[in-house]
Amino acid sequence: MILVTLFCICALVTSLQADARLSKRYVIGGCPSHCDKSMCPTMPKDCSTGQVMDHCNCCLVCASGEGEACGGVGKLGDPVCGESLECSVTGGVSYSATVRRRGKQGVCVCKSSDPVCGSDGVSYRDICELKRVSNRAQSLQQPPVLFIQRGACGTSLHDNPNSLRYKYNFIADVVEKIAPAVVHIELYRKMVYSKREMAVASGSGFVVSDDGLIVTNAHVVANKNRVKVELKNGASYDAKIKDVDEKADIALIKIDLPNKLPVLLLGRSADLRPGEFVVAIGSPFSLQNTVTTGIVSTTQRGGKELGLRNSDMDYIQTDAIINYGNSGGPLVNLDGEVIGINTLKVTAGISFAIPSDKIRQFLAESYDRLARGRGTTKKRYIGVRMMTLTPSLSKELKGRLRDFPDITSGAYVIEVISKTPAAAGGLKEHDVIISINGQRISTATDVSAIIKKESSLRVVVRRGNEDIILTIIPMEIDP
């Protein structure tokens, strides 16, 4: 009896296997251990929805389109949804291995219901409609329609508030907020052998009052003939230097214009923590409103650590890139508050800013000086343009000027401005200043330094082959 039963079971299994081979399909039991392409169903000639691999990753089948059947019992050749579609069983349940084992079929639905824009300039209901049109075009030997933008054609990021870019683009929000109050500063000097002006340096600054007060670095505006400020809208204005703290490297300049300006507010640098995001904005290499970002590396980097012997200030260290021309621009936190002035770069990834608490102190002291009528210390002025005499310049001048003296150092006088102390004292063009008040002069900077300190100058100049003594009394002017 047992032998008869075993024989019947074997016969039944053999019969089922034969039926499976005849139908070129595997029955319930899942995918085969080895892919036999001969068992795959025949691919129809017209497959407008595209071709995909079946669940067993063995047979290439014609993809089911939106609304068409998908899934099944997990056999070779079971219908599979096309690109951008997913198989959904009734009630929105996605097709899975568990559903497959239960032998349920589903319907292909689009993974996304959001509108999209195609390369043909047409807005589509969803990505699936675009793919369907693209496949149809390709079947007609036409170019495919490419998916180029989420959202309908002509829409922007603000039309899709659920976008991750819209939600987390906080750096761009900060820049948009602060950029109108950041200015580009150009410094001009007259050329050596003509009265034409040329730009010799540039920097950045930011507006702190709507009537045109601008904060920048002292070194940006120091020793320049003319300071010009360019706003974000391209308008340019000459600026006056109102106050300077050379030790702290902070300067206050002002432009006069009829309209009110957007301003930046100061944050509290004392509240900064290492690791906070910061944004540096300025005009490196005269490229306006260039933005770099980084974090606060440390909030208290001593000036003496940086080799600044006369500095008792702590600097903010950041890895936000600060380049030439960024100097004077703001370093801001994510609230758009200024927490420092971009000041110097040591190397890539190591830059420093003057803390905003120091700026606040400078502005308070400056206000106090202006309120008392003292303002900035008057600048001593003699009315001369000069440059440092070097051996190469001396050689060049000897070739041009027949009576130029045999001298290779000093301050060479390029121009004496009429009706100034220098003109009244007898200084002339092509003179070489070699000493003032008994101090030897080697550079033009030496002359400027003495003028700042002395109210009367006993100047020795070399003119031709003679040394001539002149007395010049500097006048005081607003800087």
UniProtKB/Swiss-Prot annotation:
InterPro entries: Growth_fac_rcpt_cys_sf, IGFBP-like, Kazal_dom, Kazal_dom_sf, PDZ, PDZ_sf, Peptidase_S1_PA, Peptidase_S1C. Coiled coil: none annotated. Its main location: secreted. GO terms for molecular function: growth factor binding; serine-type endopeptidase activity. Transmembrane segments: none annotated. Residues 96-155 form the Kazal-like domain. SUPFAM superfamilies: Growth factor receptor domain, Kazal-type serine protease inhibitors, PDZ domain-like, Trypsin-like serine proteases. Forms homotrimers. In the presence of substrate, may form higher-order multimers in a PDZ-independent manner. Serine protease with a variety of targets, including extracellular matrix proteins and proteoglycans. Through cleavage of proteoglycans, may release soluble FGF-glycosaminoglycan complexes that promote the range and intensity of FGF signals in the extracellular space. Regulates the availability of insulin-like growth factors (IGFs) by cleaving IGF-binding proteins. Inhibits signaling mediated by TGF-beta family members. Consequently, may regulate many physiological processes. Intracellularly, degrades TSC2, leading to the activation of TSC2 downstream targets. Belongs to the peptidase S1C family. This is Serine protease HTRA1A. It comes from Danio rerio (Zebrafish). The gene is htra1a.
